[in-house]
Amino acid sequence: SNVSILAAYSIFTQNFLLFCIANFFIGIGMAFTHQYRFAAAESVEKDKAPKAISTLLLAGIVAAFIGISLANYTKNFVSDYLYVGSYLTLAILTLVPAFLLFFFKDKRDVSIISNENNKVRSYSEFFSDPRFLQAITSAAFAYAVMSFLMTATPISMHIVHNLSLEKTGIVLQFHVLAMFLPSLVTGNLIKKHGYSKMMYAGVFFYILTILMSLFEPSYINYFIGLIFLGIGWNFLFISGTSLLVTIYKPEEKFKAQGFNDFIVYSVQAVASLCAGVFLNLTSWKTMNLICIIFIIIIVIATLRTDFLQKKPQ
């Protein structure tokens, strides 16, 4: 809340460095909200974790549309200082979860977690577990592909191919919708078909995304391609996160979750930063073809786990 006010103040004083610092700390705050999905998964039985995570991510639809609308509606609240009102609104919104968490009491038995005799595996031991590699690979490279292409989309559509900002905005809105709307059924599908099959389904939609990029770079092709991209991300990310929850022991959860998120969001950040560079050096079609590398890695990690599980002990 305070850093949102600081961001508003930096706009008011025209201090760009302070604005960057404020947004950096806003980003840190937003990173903590990603832990809510693990809290949701741990609040239910492990076989119900996929549905719990899906339900939580479904809220992203509301956030996507309300967030954009609120930002546009409040950006001119303070005349002559664009977006000061948006940041002040953000400061108020961040108080809502703070208020709810203030009254939250965890009544679960934490004796297992706090017991010093319980051995926590090292990072190398985590990596020796093929299921852990499958989970982290699915989530990380799902985010890499999605972020790599989504970040480049508005530049490719509006700057490179001269499509209107209105059409670009519609494509991105429906892409976000496709990222979260499948959450209505993803949890149930994982429970019915298993983690690996849902990961293969996510890969299938990523392949469809790449195929759409091979056609003429028209509005409708971007539109369909980005919808496939969103669905693929949903299947892969929720499957990977849900699988991770089943792997670690209670005393390992903080280490496993922290390490998972460090890898996933570091990979996403690098992919996002590289998007503009690659679009400038290559093309939209080439960027999509590059994503085949990440897809192959996901498939290999999943096939490896499936093979080892079927292999006689």
Provide a role label for each language-model segment.
Residues 251-281:
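A late C-terminal transmembrane helix in Major Facilitator Superfamily
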Residues 24-58:
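Cytoplasmic helix-loop-helix junction between adjacent transmembrane helices
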Residues 18, 55-102:
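Helix-loop-helix hairpin linking two adjacent transmembrane segments in secondary transporters
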Residues 1-14, 205-217:
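C-terminal ends and interior cores of transmembrane alpha-helices
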